[in-house]
Swiss-Prot record:
Keywords: Developmental protein, DNA-binding, Gap protein, Metal-binding, Nucleus, Repeat, Zinc, Zinc-finger. It is found in: Nucleus. Residues 17-31 have a biased composition (Basic residues). Residues 174-193 have a biased composition (Basic and acidic residues). Belongs to the hunchback C2H2-type zinc-finger protein family. GO terms for cellular component: nucleus. The gene is hb. It comes from the Eukaryota. One of its GO terms (molecular function) is zinc ion binding. Residues 16-126, 146-193 are annotated as: Disordered. Gap class segmentation protein that controls development of head structures. This is Protein hunchback.
Length: 193
């Protein structure tokens, strides 16, 4: 999930460069992990206690498994900081990354981002749509009222004059509506950030 989002975000960066980095990290960690497991495996062979071998080998497997888990978590972290660093070109992400990284979780982006990102888009969309609906209705009512006033003010004249002011009033209300939408969305963004 987040890797696809992250890949989409990275498009402006040279992808090969990023992947190369990722691989460098990966192979480096793989190597250290291998040497770790080797030293672990060699130490029990050196110990001259063959009798409690089954339980100790069991424990060893468990230990190695745990170590591997830790190693994997650590392995993901450079990827995350790398991903966060690579995502910094877009400013909106910058904010979220700086907030997402401080909690010292093994995998901050994956654990927090779904929780952070999934509810918030719905929240913002509902907020903007309601705001947009409100602004359009207000603009429409304003236009209607002024139309009524114009027509009420100019009944004795011909039918064409009230129409042209009505048109200009419409075009006047149109940018206003867009401005409302813009200010609303920017306020939402401020609220989000």
């Amino acid at each position: 999930w987040y890797s696809s989002m992250f890949a989409a975000n990275i498009k402006q960066e040279p992808i090969s460069h990023h992947h190369h980095h990722h691989h460098a990290h990966h192979s480096h960690h793989q190597h250290s992990h291998d040497s770790n497991s080797n030293s672990n495996a060699s130490s029990p062979h050196q110990s001259p206690l063959p009798s409690p071998n089954p339980p100790s080998s069991n424990n060893l497997q468990l230990e190695q498994y745990l170590k591997q888990q830790q190693q994997q978590q650590q392995q993901q972290q450079p990827m995350d900081t790398l991903c966060a660093g690579a995502m910094t070109p877009s400013p909106s992400n910058n904010d979220q990354n700086s907030r997402l990284r401080p909690p010292g979780l093994p995998n901050p982006m994956q654990t927090i981002m779904p929780a952070n990102m999934r509810p918030s888009p719905t929240a913002t969309t509902t907020a903007t749509t309601t705001a947009a609906a409100a602004s359009t209705t207000t603009a429409a009512t304003v236009a209607l009222q002024s139309n009524d006033k114009l027509q009420a003010l100019t009944p004795p004249m011909d039918v064409t004059p009230p129409k042209s002011p009505a048109k200009s009033q419409q075009s006047c209300a149109e940018p206003e509506k867009e401005h409302d939408l813009m200010s609303n969305s920017s306020e939402d963004m401020k609220y989000m950030a």
